[in-house]
Amino acid sequence: MQHSTIAAIATAPGAGGIAIVRLSGPESYEVAAKVFRPANPAKKVADAKGYTAMFGAFVEGEEAFDEGVALFFRAPHSYTGEDVVELSCHGGSAVARRLVEACIAAGASPAAPGEYTRRAFLNGKLSLTQAEAVMDIISADGRQGAALANASLNGALARKIAAQKDALTALQAHLAAWVDFPEEDVPELSQSHLCDVLDGVEQELDALIQSYDAGAVLREGVDCAIVGKPNAGKSTLLNLLAGFDRAIVTPVAGTTRDVVEQAVQLGDVRLNLFDTAGLRQTEDEIEAEGIRRSWKKLDEAGLILAVFDGSERPTREDLELAQRCAGRPAIALVNKEDKPTRFDAELIAPYFAMVLPVCCQEEGARKVIAAAVARLLGTNQIDPHAANLSGQRQLSAATRARDAVAGALDAAKGLGLDAVSVCVDDALDALCELTGENASEAVINEVFERFCVGK
C-alpha cells in the first residue's frame, strides 16, 4: 500500500537531551537528504543501508541549525514497514519544530495522530491488538500495567485468539463438508468431539473475559473513595498513601468539606484517591453539600476505603455507611489501632470484603492496605506475561465470540449441525474483528484516534 511521506516529532514536548523527528514513506530518504548533511562528505543518505546511523548537521537551505544523528531503516524492516529515517536533534521545542518544518518544506506531509502505528497495522507489521498495546505501553503508570501491554505487543493475545480461531475453523470446515457435500463420504462429527472442542474454546475465551477487570485496573488505575465519619482518619489515610501532607489534618470535626483528589501508585495499582467530607448529620449548608458529594463519590467509585474510628463504639452513621458499602468493592479500615479498641468490627464485617485494623499514622499500614487492595481487585492473580484483553472494543468482541460459542454448544445438544455452523460463523466473525482482520473503517479510526502525533 503506497502512502505519502510523513514527518512528526516522536518524542514528548518540552526540554530534554534529544528530540526525534520521524520520517516514514517512500520518499523518506529523499527528504532526509535535503535536511541532513553527513559529517563525512563521502557518505550519502541515499546509499544508507538499513539499521545504520550517520552523524551530521541539520540544514535548512544552506544554513546548518543543529547537529545530530540520522538512523536509517529500509522497508519492510521498520516499525511502519516503510522506509523510515529518524532524525535525532537536540531537545527542546524550537529545534525540533524547525526540523519538522524543514522536512515538510522538503516534501513531507505532517503526520496525523497515530499515523505511524496505523501504517504499521495496514502494512501487516502489527495486528490491531498489538497496535492497541502500543498505546497501552505509552499510557502505563505501573510496572505490571506496562508488562501486560508488552505481552500484547509481543503477540500473546494474538496467539491466544489465533489458537481459538484455528480450532473453530477446523470444526467449521468439517461441518461445511458434511452439510454441503452429503453425497461424499465425509464422516459425521461425533457430538462428544464437537462439544469438547466448543467447550475448550468457550473456557479459553471466558478466562480472558474474567481477567479483564483486574487487567484494566493495572492498565488504567481505579477511582477510590475514602469515606467515613469526621475525625475517623480519612485525611490521615490520604496523606499516608500519597506520601506527603496532601490534606489538612486537625482535631476539629468537619475540617474536610470538599472532595480532595490525589493520584497515587499503591503497589502495582494506580489509585485516583478522593478524600471526602466526614459523614454526619449537620445543619451547615456548606458541610451538607460536601457530605452529599461524599455519598456521590462512594456510589461512583471502583474501590471504597471506609475508615472507622477504632477508639469509639460504632454509631448509627457507621452502620449506615457499612450498609451502603454492601456488595461493593469495599475494604473497612478500623483506624487508631494504637489506641484501646472499643469498636466492634463484627457489626460491620458482613458488609465488606475484608476488615483491617490499622493505624493510618504508621508507614506499615500502607503495605497492609496495598496487599488488601491487590487481593480485592484481583491484580495479585494476574500473570503479566499472559494474554489479556485491553479496552471495551476487545472485551465486547471477545464476549460476542464467547456467547456465540456457547450458542453453538447449546445447538450441538439438539438443534442440529446447521445451527451449530451459524453460531461458529458468528464466533469467527467476532474473533476476526477483535484481531482487526475484518474490523470496519470506523472501528480502526476509533482505535487510532487515541494516539498522539508522532506515534
Residue spans for each PLM region:
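A glycine-rich (often HGG/GG-containing) alpha/beta subdomain
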Residues: M1-A147, A151, G155, I331
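C-terminal-of-GTPase-core extension/linker across diverse P-loop GTPases
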Residues: Q2-I9, P13, R143-Q265, T282-D284, ...
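Switch I (G2) and immediately adjacent beta-strands of P-loop GTPase domains
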Residues: F55-F65, A70-R74, G254-T282, E300
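Short glycine-/small-residue-rich Rossmann-like dinucleotide-binding loops
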Residues: A242, A277-G278, G302, D309, ...
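Short, Asp-centered acidic motifs that coordinate Mg2+ and/or phosphate
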Residues: L271, L303, I331
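Generic enzyme active-site microenvironment
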Residues: L273, V307, L333
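Inter-motif core of Ras-like GTPase G domains
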Residues: E287-S311
